[in-house]
Amino acid sequence: MDQSVAIQETLAEGEYCVIAVQGVLCEGDSRQSRLLGLVRYRLEHGGQEHALFLYTHRRMAITGDDVSLDQIVPVSRDFTLEEVSPDGELYILGSDVTVQLDTAELSLVFQLPFGSQTRMFLHEVARACPGFDSATRDPEFLWLSRYRCAELELEMPTPRGCNSALVTWPGYATIGGGRYPSRKKRWGLEEARPQGAGSVLFWGGAMEKTGFRLMERAHGGGFVWGRSARDGRRDEELEEAGREMSAAAGSRERNTAGGSNFDGLRPNGKGVPMDQSSRGQDKPESLQPRQNKSKSEITDMVRSSTITVSDKAHILSMQKFGLRDTIVKSHLLQKEEDYTYIQNFRFFAGTYNVNGQSPKECLRLWLSNGIQAPDVYCVGFQELDLSKEAFFFHDTPKEEEWFKAVSEGLHPDAKYAKVKLIRLVGIMLLLYVKQEHAAYISEVEAETVGTGIMGRMGNKGGVAIRFQFHNTSICVVNSHLAAHIEEYERRNQDYKDICSRMQFCQPDPSLPPLTISNHDVILWLGDLNYRIEELDVEKVKKLIEEKDFQMLYAYDQLKIQVAAKTVFEGFTEGELTFQPTYKYDTGSDDWDTSEKCRAPAWCDRILWKGKNITQLSYQSHMALKTSDHKPVSSVFDIGVRVVNDELYRKTLEEIVRSLDKMENANIPSVSLSKREFCFQNVKYMQLKVESFTIHNGQVPCHFEFINKPDEESYCKQWLNANPSRGFLLPDSDVEIDLELFVNKMTATKLNSGEDKIEDILVLHLDRGKDYFLSVSGNYLPSCFGSPIHTLCYMREPILDLPLETISELTLMPVWTGDDGSQLDSPMEIPKELWMMVDYLYRNAVQQEDLFQQPGLRSEFEHIRDCLDTGMIDNLSASNHSVAEALLLFLESLPEPVICYSTYHNCLECSGNYTASKQVISTLPIFHKNVFHYLMAFLRELLKNSAKNHLDENILASIFGSLLLRNPAGHQKLDMTEKKKAQEFIHQFLCNPL
């Protein structure tokens, strides 16, 4: 999820969030979550300055309302960002990165998550650091003065712990923070410095080509960075290619000189075994990653006599692949079969819906009973925590409980290391490998996709971990799809959303993100929630009792949908020889005896896709009774490509020799199949795609869409090019998709005519010329993104009005009244709002999970068209789709129901209902009408809470963030103030209006 969007909503005009990353601020024993954003400001004289904005939050940072500005650190000349660790610290593969931020009098320590986002963040911070040219004017940061606390003078030190928006000015603020010996080069523009004795320096496929070379240290093992003269083009190219392509392929040379255990040119394994003398040196508690165990617990879990460390270097800097290196890498991939062979490794895949329970039983009956020790464990959970706190916020103690239970349940005959843990609300995935294989795991990435309502709720969706094992790419997906027997289409949509939205960044930034399908091996597990259809409960139970699973399987929804090629096309599932895994009475093997008496079903499944995969077992585990589901496991033998060191070296030398003969003086040239693109009748939240092909000539080239002068991005906010950059071999093609999507951020200006579907894209060739692409089209105005007062003055459907009238009404001031206007008499509330609420009032007041279960995308488009054309009689959609459309409508309002100007007054009187009503009475007439109308509707829903299971807290949480929004560019609220906003709405749900 791109959290820079949430930060951007808090910034003033001229300020731009370049990139954001989630981290943890470490102060002594304290651990506090922080969102770090690098913000750029363009100066009037043409230069630019940067600052690091630190935000507090507990809820997922989706919009600006979810974050609260805590502190600002200008990126000045004395600013440095450095990876740190205590002497002899041991890293677990995939663990968090600890960095120290230093200015003249400021020192803060953060833990950042392992992955490409951290790598890109650190790279952008390094680029932002000002140079050391004395002739260059020092940054002044005058633009940050607006964020300083009004009651504080510039000369006053910044009080530590102040939760207001603070600017940490060089020389004025002193905030404590531990300092630790450096393990990596400093971030900023300093040169890399040799490490002290006893340190170990790691490198891998993501190192920048800075002119530094790897040299053996004179004293003891290990290597240091230093400058050296080039000693021949051939040796340098082999060395550089080996460093930058270790993720793709290569040989594994052991360098034993001086007692070093450093792994040299490594094609696939990225870790470096730590010297034996390092064992037993525990990582201080102050530097423990939030999701990692203490060192003693990790060692016990790994059961290892030697600890394997990860290649931390490959996440520290963005690669800058040269043209020659990319060509070498491409040729190596093409010749992969010449230097690799297939070797089988044993994989365990398991899935368990734990129904919000804590672990009560030993998991060895599921994870290790009756099988040989697997080489890799992939363990997925669903419904880890069903509490409302977990539903709306990040943290849950259940994560640590189940992590510990799994670690203790791994096979006792082997030693394992945790590679990665990823969680989205109640969906969690764990990846472990045998200790001896950890050195061959690389390019670990983890991502999440929520498919809950409005994309906000992670109660449904998927998490995935992708990695390179030797020379085979593997992706493991754990998903929890929509519930209820009749919602199979929603499940199909969830699957498609996960496939389309799950993207993993590559080490090479010039390459587009990887999708799930871009892997050699895919394992997909989870509670897919497909049920048995067309059979009553008793018939299902009878077939189970007779063990006639083949007959029962004929009515399985997943089988039917796969056969229809609507989901999991190309995937394989083993034969179901075990009884359905859902639904049981908790603590027993008895089928559901509750009032709902749900029919048994194979909800929990494991599928796979790829070559050289053999399933050895597929079973459920009836002995575990903690949940109303039974866990499922599958064991596979998976053929993985392993590098032959000698053959790799020969192949690499042949490629380098052949490239020595190439002429590099040629200017690249391409041809484009199309240069003008017209998007006709663009609609709100409806993706439009136009494609074209780039055909390369005879010279390899890099291409990229570049920014036009004085613009923040290469295209307007509603447009995107996929991929936006890449590399082309001679006489090769690549298809580019221009994707146009109008959302709440862009709809209002398109409605008003302030913006149009017009843009020019600049396609740049490295060492070549630029190509200009013209984009045009027309946008169909929509009620989504239109102001409340505008819609009240539109008695006709918006699509029946002239564009001039729509523009005039949209640009009217929000405080326009209903008297004295020369326009037609307005309606009290927007007719579009009435249509949706009336539909829900007539059809959905008793609907279970209303406003909590997402609708279908196709139905939303139908609802939008009915509202915009006024053809309400044609409205035919599920209650959940109409409910989600209502929420999207409120979210798209450019001025929220409770106007920005009264927002803080609402917070101040959230505990006083009389004062709260007084604030509402000051709203513009149309906004006040809408607020009272919505509150009356929600109170009607609460009258039916016995059927729809809604309560005041759920509705206040959902509607609070939609009706109450903080003004853009103002300081965001902390968690205490967010609760005040919820309490404000809660009052109107519990008291008479």
Curated annotation (Swiss-Prot):
It is a peripheral membrane protein. Isoprenylation at Cys-990 may be required for localization at the membrane. May be proteolytically cleaved after Lys-320 as inferred from N-terminal protein sequence of the 75 kda form. Its EC number is 3.1.3.36. GO terms for molecular function: inositol-1,3,4,5-tetrakisphosphate 5-phosphatase activity; inositol-1,4,5-trisphosphate 5-phosphatase activity; metal ion binding; phosphatidylinositol-4,5-bisphosphate 5-phosphatase activity. Substrate binds at residues 383, 459-460, 582-583, 596-598. Gene3D superfamilies: 2.30.29.110, Endonuclease/exonuclease/phosphatase, Immunoglobulins, Rho GTPase activation protein. Interacts with APPL1, PHETA1 and PHETA2. Interacts with several Rab GTPases, at least RAB1A, RAB2A, RAB5A, RAB6A, RAB8A, RAB9A and RAB33B; these interactions may play a dual role in targeting INPP5B to the specific membranes and stimulating its phosphatase activity. Interacts preferentially with non-phosphorylated RAB8A; phosphorylation of RAB8A on 'Thr-72' disrupts this interaction. Interacts with INPP5F. Mg(2+) binds at residues 355, 383. Hydrolyzes phosphatidylinositol 4,5-bisphosphate (PtIns(4,5)P2) and the signaling molecule phosphatidylinositol 1,4,5-trisphosphate (PtIns(1,4,5)P3), and thereby modulates cellular signaling events. InterPro entries: Endo/exonu/phosph_ase_sf, Ig-like_fold, INPP5B_PH_dom, IP5, IPPc, OCRL-1_2_ASH, OCRL1/INPP5B_INPP5c, Rho_GTPase_activation_prot. Residues 821-993 form the Rho-GAP domain. Residues 224-302 are annotated as: Disordered. Residues 228-243 have a biased composition (Basic and acidic residues). Residues 669-782 are annotated as: ASH. This is Type II inositol 1,4,5-trisphosphate 5-phosphatase. Keywords: Cytoplasm, Cytoplasmic vesicle, Endosome, Golgi apparatus, Hydrolase, Lipid metabolism, Lipoprotein, Magnesium, Membrane, Metal-binding, Methylation, Prenylation. PANTHER family: INOSITOL 5-PHOSPHATASE (PTHR11200), TYPE II INOSITOL 1,4,5-TRISPHOSPHATE 5-PHOSPHATASE (PTHR11200:SF300). The record marks 852 as: Arginine finger. It comes from the Eukaryota. GO terms for biological process: flagellated sperm motility; in utero embryonic development; inositol phosphate metabolic process; phosphatidylinositol dephosphorylation; regulation of protein processing; signal transduction; spermatogenesis. A lipid is attached at residue 990 (S-farnesyl cysteine). Residues 22-148 form the PH domain. It is found in: Cytoplasm, Cytosol; Endoplasmic reticulum-Golgi intermediate compartment; Early endosome membrane; Membrane. The gene is INPP5B. The lineage of its organism: Eukaryota, Metazoa, Chordata, Craniata, Vertebrata. The modification Cysteine methyl ester is found at residue 990. PROSITE patterns: RHOGAP (PS50238).
